[in-house]
């Protein structure tokens, strides 16, 4: 088999789990001598992508699948030309709109297309549109696999988001504490997410829970990392809480590319999906809740269950609520098991989610997909 040349395709390079995942894939593929290029729109993570040394091609993808034929034709021609110039042997899409265009370009270029679905929150009709022209599908969790199985008759590979455990590892936080005017002995709860829709609601529930938790933990501080359309509403709520508590203890950092520094600062992290995994890699205790509901404290005994629902982001048995978040954070604080639990969680992430291990089944899928595609072409 000839050497593999991969083109990764994303809508944009904004700061979020999917883009961070692709960044880690690019690093790992290149470290193994696999040529990897990326085509994407704008985004604040472009600078980090450039540092990997990969070839970056910027393209303005539509925001929805609905696009006029002239605009689609221009995009397709540009992509087909790019695939030819880069001598790409496999295209890997990660988001619906760019993935749909890329899959069509791959078909026109007689190149196999792989699509990774990163969540269950996309319209089923959009998922179907991409999967019907996909040669191999990847789900990042078991619930995502179940979600797309009715639309894809072939085998679906489960390949989790890999974590760069060298980058995400325990580190000191005194300098950042001083910068944010957080006392050395203060207890810090961190929430990291885009502040939109379900994730914004979780943020509101957390802030309300922390208002009550402040009575139990007088030296409590809360850090909210992320931007989004509902950030203003969250800030207004925080201002009201500060007024009633007569103390400003909720901090907003906006979007951060080096979120690992904030994990290091936190005693506890509330999050889901990739945030939960990154925090655990940094030895931080995690309360997981996501798009589909609440899981709770993650520990070595329930780690497998937490992974199976992707830490509340792709499945859940109960809804998130202010009362349950308050209860679990208070119990976690009173148990004083943060440090040993954090160490156990990092070991589990190293064992199951290290990007250096996760990349291996993906490379195998690349090789088998190209081989199957070429065999089918020979028959036809």
Which role does the model predict for each range below?
Residues 225, 234-256:
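Nucleotide-activated donor-binding/catalytic signature segment of Leloir-type glycosyltransferases, i.e.
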Residues 93-99, 117:
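Short His-centered aromatic/hydrophobic patch
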Residues 7, 182-203, 207-210, 223:
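Conserved donor-binding/catalytic core segment of Leloir-type glycosyltransferases
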Residues 17, 316-367:
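A charged, aromatic-enriched C-terminal amphipathic alpha-helix characteristic of glycosyltransferases
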Residues 134-170:
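Donor nucleotide-sugar binding/catalytic pocket of nucleotide-sugar-dependent glycosyltransferases
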Residues 3, 8-16, 20-22, 27-70, ...:
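N-terminal strand-loop element at the rim of the active site
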Residues 78, 169-182:
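A short helix/loop element that forms part of the nucleotide-sugar donor recognition site in Leloir-type
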């Amino acid at each position: 088999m000839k050497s593999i040349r991969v083109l990764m395709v994303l809508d944009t390079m904004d700061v979020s789990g999917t883009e961070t995942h692709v960044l880690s894939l690019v690093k790992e593929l290149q470290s193994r001598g696999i040529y990897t290029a990326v085509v994407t729109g704008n985004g604040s993570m472009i600078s980090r992508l450039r540092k990997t040394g990969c070839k970056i091609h910027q393209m303005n993808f539509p925001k929805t699948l609905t696009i006029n034929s002239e605009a689609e034709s221009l995009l397709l021609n540009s992509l087909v030309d790019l695939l030819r110039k880069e001598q790409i042997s496999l295209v890997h899409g990660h988001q619906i709109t760019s993935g749909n265009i890329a899959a069509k370009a791959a078909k026109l270029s007689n190149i196999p297309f792989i699509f990774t679905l990163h969540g269950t929150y996309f319209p089923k009709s959009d998922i179907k549109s991409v999967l019907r022209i996909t040669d191999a599908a990847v789900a990042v969790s078991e619930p995502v696999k179940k979600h797309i199985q009715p639309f894809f008759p072939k085998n679906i590979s489960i390949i989790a988001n890999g974590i760069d455990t060298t980058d995400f590892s325990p580190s000191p936080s005194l300098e950042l504490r001083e910068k944010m005017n957080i006392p050395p002995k203060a207890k810090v709860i961190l929430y990291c997410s885009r502040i939109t829709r379900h994730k914004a609601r979780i943020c509101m529930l957390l802030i309300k829970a922390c208002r009550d938790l402040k009575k139990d933990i007088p030296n409590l501080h809360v850090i909210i990392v992320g931007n989004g359309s509902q950030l203003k509403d969250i800030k207004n709520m925080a201002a009201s809480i500060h007024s009633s508590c007569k103390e400003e203890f909720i901090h907003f950092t906006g979007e951060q590319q080096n979120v690992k520094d904030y994990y290091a600062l936190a005693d506890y992290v509330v999050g889901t999906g990739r945030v939960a995994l990154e925090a655990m890699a940094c030895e931080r205790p995690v309360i997981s809740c996501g798009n589909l509901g609440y899981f709770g404290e993650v520990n070595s005994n329930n780690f497998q269950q937490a992974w199976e629902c992707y830490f509340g982001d792709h499945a859940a048995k109960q809804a998130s609520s202010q009362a349950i978040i308050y209860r679990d954070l208070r119990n976690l604080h009173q148990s004083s098991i943060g440090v040993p639990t954090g160490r156990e969680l990092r070991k589990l992430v190293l064992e199951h989610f290290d990007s250096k291990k996760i990349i291996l089944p993906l490379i195998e899928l690349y090789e088998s997909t190209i081989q199957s595609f070429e065999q089918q072409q020979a028959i036809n």
